[in-house]
Amino acid sequence: MSVGHIEWGKFKIYHCEDSDLDGAPNLEFPFIPGSKFKAVNTGIDEAGVQVNYEDFVKGEDIVWTVSHDEVQYVVSGEAEIEYHLPPLMIETGKVVAKAGSVYLLPRGTRVVWRVLSDEPFRHLCICFPNPGYPIPVAESNKDAG
């Protein structure tokens, strides 16, 4: 019987560049026609964590269920966040997040983002463990090791 081994990560750094998201293509969330968001992978993409930089824009509500633990740090913009916590989704809440806010979405949380600001709701998503979202690496960090 073999014993699993620890997969060690590498040190990575990313400096949040507005131009990375400003130049990214508009994407649409699955199952939410008319939704619009932008996302880039920061290059921090290891077995234990994936960090993406995202914009959600005013319009359609974004409804999602996270399959991993996720911490988000808001860089700019403002959004109302409604959450429903597992296991039965009975425990719920609604908050407003804005620049400087940081929050945890525990694994299994159903979340609804409603962007309130005219500017995008720009945020860093730190996902544990790495969910493997197929997001292209930020232009400013393509050559980083």
Task: List the model feature ranges, each with a label.
Residues 1-53, 61, 141-145:
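A short, N-terminal "cap"/entry segment at the start of jelly-roll beta-barrel domains
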Residues 6-10, 87, 112-145:
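Double-stranded beta-helix
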Residues 40-43, 52-53, 61-67, 83, ...:
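Short histidine-centered beta-strand/loop micro-motifs
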Residues 47-71, 87, 107:
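Conserved short histidine dyad/triad with adjacent acidic residue
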Residues 63-64, 81-82, 105, 110-118, ...:
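Short beta-strand His + acidic residue motifs that chelate non-heme Fe in jelly-roll/DSBH
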Residues 71, 100-101, 111:
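Hydrophobic/aromatic beta-strand elements that line small-molecule binding cavities or substrate pockets
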Residues 75-76:
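A cytosolic small-molecule/anion-sensing beta-strand core signal
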Residues 86-107:
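Short acidic-glycine-tyrosine-enriched beta hairpin
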